[in-house]
UniProtKB/Swiss-Prot annotation:
Induction: By heat shock.
Location of this chain's protein in the cell: Cytoplasm
Catalytic activity, EC: 3.4.21.53
Organism: Salinispora arenicola (strain CNS-205)
The protein's name: Lon protease
Ligand binding (ATP): G346, P347, P348, G349, V350, G351, K352, T353
Gene Ontology terms: cellular component: cytoplasm
């Protein structure tokens, strides 16, 4: 145990065998002076990291005291042996004195030499990269393993913490293990850094080479008198010559200025050129002249589509207003609130998408279709900001660029199929586009200049109105396309579908003919849809079979109702209301689905068992509540309705709505359920020609419902002749086509008692129908 002055080291770690210079400040100067005063000039060098002394230091001797080339006082000290720091003791001078016990070094373990061999090899690889051949020779000459390990104190890329860890490890095997791991990690980092440097160097060399080649190419073109490719000067001339709004021109000239300052090899130059090309391709002040002939516009719409009176009238109103404003010099181009947005809602196949092209033809405008089905990124509407690689303008800007005018007809197809994704809600981005009060200053993220959309006629199509977000629907004028009557389907098939499918099959009118009777039968018995897509597929099937026959028999083919089954097989649909309602407990209801209106049967039966109500057919909560209301109404009002009040007592009631795989919901089946239960209790079947729809209350009132037109069209297609609807839905009958109004007898009733009196067959005393008591015991 020796008493030595402490030499604190804050920016170095001294290991045994090392000699390092130490700059002298008052603290280190005091330690050096104290050591020199003892005669043996020994002191204890201790690393001091983050203000704390380590547990192990090095007994060192002072070899020289003098000044550095910078003039600062310094001393050279050499490490002798590791020593553990003991407690402080008093001593002469201002230095800190402590007791120090030298640490004995254990004998090297058996694997120490293997570690030393690996350490030499790794250090040789590191030093070869730096060209330190003399250091390599010195390491190879070291035979003492402890000396070899402690020589790592000279390595510059080891941190002070790592060197302190080496100092605190007296076992040479432990030190060599630490060094091998550190050198391996350093070599891996060096390889990565070298690869990065190589890639950067190759990239710079490639850029320099391309720059020199471009300069040479420019010189060669100049000598040959060839035109140079578009540069910043050319873009400036194009911008100044283009017919651009003043704010857009200013923004474009600013970008041209950036292009002039940017290097040709810079990626930013390419982005600026792409942006300028997009701006210059936009039809900023180009507008087509609208057709002012309302008669001609109506003729175009009628020629392309049968029916759809509401849509056609709205287009003609829009055109008439614009013509009147032109005549009175009120101005129609642009301006706040001057746009128009129509939403065409209806089942598939009714012609919503094709109607957009007809509207454009009728107005004399260009037409662009923007498909929105499945779009889930807000940037698809507003565009990507130019900070992103591969940024593009949004679909609205691209549609205007494609149209080549600022007043096209833009069809936003399948707007109800928009989806919310992690990149935002595209429906929310459409709010500004479709708001006539805002879209005169629409700003695309890519262009970042105001774009006037107020003169664009937007048409949006949707199958399910409820799927459109309410704020978006509020900005559109809703026009409902409920489907076609049978006469309209025949006209569409005769004038459009039949010629198109005949031409696709490679046939002529002389080779095959189809009568209107066949078209009517296909529409009524082979298809049951609101639109005409399945009708067109049926015609295509007929023409394909005729084409096959024509290869062996060139005789003309006439398809009539007698031979239609040869081409399409047996009819797929037939009136089934009479068969289904022939027994008590079955009523025919009307419903609206995503494919239009449809007929819905409600079946009721009762059985002995625990009293209660069983509901099947995948009914939603609202429909289940309607069934409960219907049953409660009959139980409380049975005697007033002429029904046995005890017929339902102690019985299990089962209510089923067929097509069990299809989910169903809504309140409009209320009176149908009451009628089915009343038919079950009374034993009087429902009249087969009747269909009905309406919500019911506990007091027996028939409340209004929606989708009346679609439901009545479905009743007409299904062969029903009489329909019951709530009295408050009577104004909806004005929307019915004249053909359907003539074919259907519509009863508007306010009380369910009147519904039962009208819909149930009269009681027949001679029939084998069950009375209430017989039913209760059946």
């Amino acid at each position: 145990m020796a008493t030595l002055p402490v030499l604190p080291l804050t920016d170095a770690v001294l290991l045994p065998g090392m000699a390092i210079p130490v700059t002298l400040d008052p603290t280190t100067q005091a330690a050096v002076d104290a050591a020199r005063a003892t005669g043996d000039q020994r002191l204890l060098a201790v690393p001091r990291l983050d203000g704390e002394y380590g547990p192990v230091g090095v007994v060192a001797t002072i070899e020289k005291v003098g000044r550095l080339p910078s003039g600062e006082p310094a001393a050279v000290v050499r490490g002798l042996a590791r020593a553990r720091i003991g407690s402080g003791v008093p001593g002469p001078g201002a230095a800190l004195w402590v007791e120090a016990a030298e640490l004995a070094e254990p004998a090297p373990a058996g694997r120490a030499r293997e570690l030393a061999r690996e350490y030499r090899a790794l250090m040789t690889s590191v030093l070869q990269q730096r060209g330190a051949w003399q250091v390599i020779d010195a390491i190879e000459r070291m035979t003492d393993l402890s000396e070899l390990a402690d020589s790592a104190g000279y390595v510059s890329w080891l941190s002070l913490a790592q060197k302190t860890e080496l100092l605190a490890a007296p076992d040479v095997t432990t030190r060599l293990e630490l060094l091998v791991g550190w050198v391996r990690a350093h070599l891996a980092e060096q390889e990565v850094a070298e690869q990065i440097n190589t890639d950067v160097r190759e990239g710079l060399e490639k850029s320099q080479r391309e720059f020199l080649l471009r300069q040479q190419l420019a010189t060669i073109r100049k000598e040959l008198g060839e035109d140079e490719p578009e540069g910043s000067a050319d873009y400036r001339a194009r911008v100044e010559a283009a017919d651009l709004p003043a704010p857009v021109r200013d923004a474009a000239l600013r970008e041209v200025g950036k292009l002039e300052r940017a290097s040709d090899a810079s990626p930013e130059a390419g982005w600026i050129r792409t942006w300028l090309d997009t701006v210059l391709e936009m039809p900023w002040n180009t507008r087509t002249e609208d057709n002012t002939d309302l008669v001609a516009a109506r003729a175009v719409l009628d020629a392309d589509h049968a029916g759809l009176t509401d849509v056609k009238d709205r287009i003609l109103e829009y055109l008439a207003v614009r013509n009147r404003r032109v005549e009175r010099n009120l101005g129609v181009v642009g301006g706040r609130g001057s746009g128009a947005v129509l939403a065409l809602a209806g089942p598939p196949g009714v012609g919503k998408t094709s109607l957009g092209e007809s509207v454009a033809r009728a107005l004399g405008r260009r037409f662009v279709r923007v498909s929105l089905g499945g779009v889930r990124d807000e940037a698809e509407i507003r565009g990507h900001r130019r900070t992103y690689v591969g940024a593009l303008p949004g679909r609205i800007v691209r549609a205007l660029r494609e149209a080549g005018s600022m007043n096209p007809v833009v069809l936003l197809d399948e707007v109800d199929k928009l989806a919310v994704g992690y990149s935002g809600d595209p429906a929310a981005a459409l709010l500004e586009v479709l708001d006539p009060a805002q879209n005169h200053t629409f700003r695309d993220h890519y262009l970042e200049v105001d774009l006037d959309l107020s003169d664009v006629l937007f048409l949006a199509t949707a199958n399910v109105v409820e799927a459109i977000p309410s704020p978006l629907l509020d900005r559109m004028e809703l026009v409902t396309l409920d489907g076609y009557t049978e006469d309209e389907k025949v006209a569409i098939a005769r004038d459009h579908l039949l010629p198109r499918q005949r031409e696709r099959a490679g046939l002529t009118a002389d080779e095959v003919t189809i009568s209107d009777g066949v078209l009517a039968r296909i529409a009524g018995e082979y298809t049951r849809e609101a639109g005409v897509r399945q009708l067109e597929r049926s015609l295509a099937k007929i023409f394909r079979k005729v084409a096959v026959t024509a290869t062996t028999d060139p005789a003309p083919v006439h398809v009539d109702t007698g031979n239609l089954h040869r081409y399409l097989g047996r009819p797929k649909f037939s009136p089934e209301s009479a068969e289904r309602t022939a027994v008590p407990g079955v009523a025919t209801g009307l419903a609206v689905t995503g494919a239009g209106g449809d007929v819905l049967f409600v079946e009721a039966t009762s059985m002995a068992g625990e009293p209660g109500l069983t509901l099947t057919g995948q009914l939603g909560d609202v429909m289940k509540e309607s069934a409960q209301i219907a049953l409660s109404y009959l139980r409380s009002n049975g005697r007033r309705l002429g029904l046995d009040p005890n017929a339902l007592a102690g019985r299990r009631i089962h209510l089923h709505v067929p097509a069990g795989a299809v989910p169903k919901d809504g309140p409009s089946a209320g009176i149908t359920m009451v009628t089915a239960l009343a038919s079950l209790v009374s034993g009087r079947p429902v009249r087969p020609e009747f269909g009905m729809t309406g919500e019911v209350t506990l007091s027996g009132r028939a409340l209004p419902i929606g989708g009346v037109k679609q439901k009545l069209l479905a009743a007409h297609r299904a062969g029903l002749t009489e329909v019951i609807i709530p009295q408050r839905n009577e104004p909806d009958l004005d929307d019915l086509p004249a053909e359907v109004r003539e074919a259907l007898t519509v009863h508007t009733l306010a009380d369910v008692a009147d519904v039962l009196a009208l819909a149930l067959r009269p009681a027949d005393l001679d029939a084998d129908s069950l009375d209430g008591e017989a039913l209760a015991t059946a």
